[in-house]
Regions:
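Conserved C-terminal structural/oligomerization subdomain of aldehyde/semialdehyde dehydrogenase
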Residues: 18, 72-73, 117, 124-178
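ALDH superfamily catalytic-core signature
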Residues: 1-134, 157-158
């Protein structure tokens, strides 16, 4: 093997994150927000599927929505910008198509969900959180490469492990617990 070449692969991801009821919630909120909304969700390891234990679901989701709604969308050269545009119109259309299909199948937009008019010089989409009763809805199942977080409820550890592993894009995952 005289000519072994180094290779760097860009792999697909639909990374799950789970928060158990004993987790440090502030730490989890900060990590989840940075993980999905950092780089406008355009990372193969963005934590785009969130599983919350039932006992903390409502309170945690309310705090997460509040954080997401405060994210400043804008141009990359503006000092107060916290999240910039998507990389292409094709990507924007794919996100919108998946959100529409998810809503038609019972998903519920909790914040964001529609393209932004912040500028006509880019493809802007706000931080978006969608509640999914089923972890196989389009925004929870398909790689979107955008600031779209699907949120689902679970009761027991074995249940959430099965759901986390039930996706073809298994690249990384995150667990918040004590």
């Amino acid at each position: 093997a005289e000519n072994l070449s180094q290779v760097s692969l860009e792999l697909g991801g639909k990374s799950p994150v789970v928060v158990f009821d004993d987790a440090d919630q502030e730490n989890a909120l900060n990590g989840i927000t940075a993980g999905i909304f950092g780089a406008s969700g355009q990372s193969c390891i963005a934590g785009s599927r969130l599983y919350l234990q039932s006992s903390i679901y409502d309170e945690f989701l309310k705090k997460l929505i509040s954080k997401a709604e405060k994210i400043k969308l804008g141009g990359p050269m503006e000092k107060d910008t916290q999240m910039g545009p998507l990389n292409s119109f094709k990507q924007l259309e794919n996100i919108e198509k998946n959100i529409k299909a998810t809503i038609e199948q019972g998903g519920k937009i909790r914040c964001g969900g529609k393209r932004s008019s912040v500028s006509n010089k880019g493809y802007y989409f706000p931080a978006t959180i969608i509640e999914c009763k089923n972890h196989n809805l389009p925004v929870a199942e398909n790689e979107l490469f955008g600031p779209i977080l699907s949120v689902m409820k679970f009761d027991k550890e074995d249940e959430v492990i099965n759901k986390m592993n039930d996706n073809k894009y298994g690249l990384s995952s995150g667990v918040y617990t004590s």
